[in-house]
Curated annotation (Swiss-Prot):
This is Glutathione S-transferase Mu 1. Residues 2-88 form the GST N-terminal domain. One of its GO terms (cellular component) is cytoplasm. It catalyses: RX + glutathione = an S-substituted glutathione + a halide anion + H(+); prostaglandin A2 + glutathione = prostaglandin A2-S-(R)-glutathione; prostaglandin J2 + glutathione = prostaglandin J2-S-(R)-glutathione; prostaglandin J2 + glutathione = prostaglandin J2-S-(S)-glutathione. GO terms for biological process: glutathione derivative biosynthetic process; glutathione metabolic process; hepoxilin biosynthetic process; prostaglandin metabolic process. Keywords: Cytoplasm, Lipid metabolism, Transferase. The gene is GSTM1. It is an enzyme of class 2 (transferase).
Amino acid sequence: MPMILGYWDIRGLAHAIRLLLEYTDTNYEERQYSVGDAPDYDRSQWLNEKFKLGLDFPNLPYLIDGTHKLTQSNAILRYIARKHNLCGETEEEMIRVDILENQVMDVRLAMARICYSPDFEKLKPGFLKEIPEKIKLFSEFLGKRPWFAGDKLTYVDFLVYDVLDMHRIFEPKCLDAFPNLKDFISRFEGLKKISAYMKSSRFLPGPLFMKLAVWGNK
């Protein structure tokens, strides 16, 4: 039985999950829900199913794997990662994984906040000014390691890749001063399964956000 991943028909919070499912060669199917156009942004496609799936906290994304039904994007990532020993092995690695998972969410939410704001154009210059400092912290945390937890790939590499790529789309030169992050991105995109997925018709590079967003909605 394939796992079922449910999410909007956008990149959003499912990007790292899709990448991890592909990397681990997991048998899965997607249920993608669409949102209507302005001004109503009709969500009935999802709302009609929302409370019929047996989810404890009905939301998107969700993952159904037999009797296991999960929501919350990071819980889903961890569930898949545990099956493939991608959560870090030593205490040091697991600490790095835990810190980074939460740091990435903070950075992602800060970006989403301005991209969904009607004051986007007013907020954009201030946001652009903050990007180098945010990116620098990731660069220093990675250091000379190949992956963010250490020598081995973990699920947080999928999260960091996603958030760095989003910032790269927003400001194409934002990684230029950080060669170790550019190398990390090349290393990640060069993984055999990831590279094959990115060339496939299943790959969904965008839109980054929903139609309600001011930026990243196409």
